[in-house]
A protein has these predicted regions:
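Ligand-site clamp/hinge motif
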Residues: 96, 191, 219-265, 395
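Surface-exposed binding/hinge segments that line
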Residues: 128-181
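Structural transition elements
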Residues: 203, 293, 298, 323-356, ...
Length: 526
């Protein structure tokens, strides 16, 4: 009966898609994408999920950017040039003078200042990324200077993020926005920016119906090359099977969240192209370091036992991808490869649990979002975690939650033990330090404090933040990864494979390690 209901629901959803969007693919200028939406906001100062980054990359511009195909160099975007002070603490950007916002307003240094200060003061989910900026100042209409507390080699990479989008200050202020120090309490522009965009990207956000669809329209005032598609429609399809069926039927152009098995089922279909490759994402178990929240899982010995209990090869069989050496994404600068990955050892896990006083087993409640991302079902992985830990006497109760509720508990550090997915905020190894105190994931989300670390590790963290020479950085990040393999409240267990598929007449598809998908470079064969 349950299977019948599932099949009926699938065909009902496909019928709805066809009735609403069925003519879209017949019109060459409309792009339809199936995805599992995971955003809670499109306001650049508040939204901080993969869905947010994809949409805001299309609707906003930043001072600098990466090439379309990779993250190999920093390129000008709204800034046509920049200078760095001798001590590495002041970055001065000269703005291009032909760029305008979607409503036709000129982009000025004051807009840059407003956008950065609002990001800092709004205290939204991504605001921490601007913590390392002491001040931002408009020198004149076309020149803006950032002052940092200390030299930071990753700064230019950081500000490529859609979090640092330049917003139209006048439009945002007219709708309740402010960059004042009390913006967290007084700014009311969130609803406005979640329903439309105030940027200068190739598209404009026209409509967002949470957990249903997001619609973009072409920005006719775009200062760069006009995109091919007049309209882009993202349809929320939480199940990869639904995306696969819609793609095969020709009802969508691109299926963004497919499992390796689902992609394999599309092989040989001449109407469909397939992309596979390693992602920059990491699935991990997080154990709160406050005992009143996670109980025995605040104990470092128990945390290590959990790491030894997980069946790393099993997750690779389920979803493809690779086993991470640490939370740093496999394949990046200094990241441990599979040759240094953590290995399962059930005897060691049981020995550690006995050492911690739990030879007879213990109970765990595992919190996680009830969602699918990249074709990976969090429920399926959670059930696998449950089965793995049962083999060493840890009885796991699964607590799936609605994405917004689960995110709030995770981000506020109120969770006990959780299962989450993480991707880099910036394409620099410094981002790995988010998993070490006082990094955001470690401390704000998991209450792991800097003073709990040995002094030599604290010193390494401080040195890694300012090191610029490749050999020095390599040595520091290698040592820090060695430490976190054996210590700390995280158990990273899989870097999943990117598996997407699209209609063969869709041209220009590139999976990008930073913004994942750039709809502005796509076109359709005539």
């Amino acid at each position: 009966m349950n299977r019948f209901k599932h099949v009926l629901l699938l065909f009902t959803l496909l019928a709805l898609i066809l009735s609403v969007f069925g003519t879209a693919l017949a019109e060459d200028k409309i792009l339809v994408i199936g995805w599992s939406e995971n955003t809670d906001a499109y306001d650049p100062a508040n939204g901080f999920t993969h869905s947010t980054h994809i949409v805001n990359h299309a609707t906003y511009s930043q001072l600098v950017t990466f090439p379309d195909e990779d993250a190999s160099q920093i390129l000008p975007q709204l800034a046509e040039s920049w200078e760095i002070s001798a001590d590495g603490t002041v970055y001065t950007f000269s703005l291009r003078q032909d760029a305008t916002f979607a409503n036709g307003d000129d982009i000025t240094a004051d807009d840059v200042v407003f956008s950065i200060q609002r990001l800092q003061n709004y205290n939204g989910n991504p605001s921490f990324l601007a913590d390392g900026i002491d001040s931002v100042e408009a020198i004149d209409d076309d020149t803006v200077a950032f002052t940092l507390p200390a030299a930071r080699p990753s700064f230019l990479s950081e500000i490529t993020s859609a979090v640092f989008s330049v917003t139209n200050a006048d439009a945002v202020m007219a709708n309740g926005g402010t960059d004042a120090m009390d913006a967290a309490e007084t700014d009311t522009a969130g609803a406005y920016l979640d329903s439309t965009s105030a940027g200068s990207g190739p598209y404009v956000l026209e409509n967002w119906e949470p957990q249903n669809r997001t619609e973009l329209v072409r920005n006719e005032n775009y200062w760069g090359d006009q995109p091919y598609f007049d309209r882009v429609i993202f349809i929320h399809m939480p199940e990869g099977a639904t995306q696969k069926a819609a793609l095969e039927a020709g009802d969508i152009d691109l299926a963004f969240d497919l499992s390796p098995d689902q992609v394999a089922g599309l092989e040989g279909n001449e109407a469909i192209e397939i992309y596979r490759g390693p992602s920059t994402l990491t699935h991990f178990v997080i154990m709160n370091t406050e005992e009143e929240k996670s109980g025995p899982f605040a104990n470092p010995t128990v945390q290590l036992a959990v790491r030894y209990a997980l069946d790393y090869e099993g997750y690779k069989t389920l979803w493809g991808g690779v086993t991470p050496g640490t939370n740093m994404w496999v394949g990046f600068f200094s990241a441990f490869g599979e040759d240094r990955a953590f290995s399962r050892d059930l005897d060691k896990a049981r020995e550690l649990l006995a050492e911690a006083g739990y030879a007879d087993g213990l109970e765990m409640e595992l919190e996680y979002p009830d969602m699918v991302y990249g074709g990976v079902s969090f429920n399926t992985n959670a059930q696998k975690i449950q089965a793995d830990l049962a083999e060493v006497g840890i009885n796991v109760t699964l607590l799936p939650g609605e994405i917004q509720v689960a995110l709030e508990r995770y981000r506020s550090g109120e969770h006990g033990v959780g299962y989450w997915l993480w991707g880099p905020d910036i394409l620099d190894p410094l981002d790995f330090l988010s998993f070490m105190p006082p990094g955001k994931v470690a401390t704000e989300r998991n209450n792991w404090q800097l003073d709990s670390l040995p002094q030599d590790i604290q010193d390494m963290i401080a040195a890694a933040k300012v090191a610029s020479e490749p050999d020095e950085r390599m040595a520091l990040f290698t040592a820090l990864q060695e430490y976190t393999q054996q210590n700390g409240p995280f158990a990273p267990f899989n870097v999943p494979e990117v598996a997407t598929a699209y209609r063969s007449n869709l041209q220009g598809y590139i999976w990008h390690p930073h913004w994942l998908l750039d709809v502005a470079i796509l076109s359709r064969a005539e």
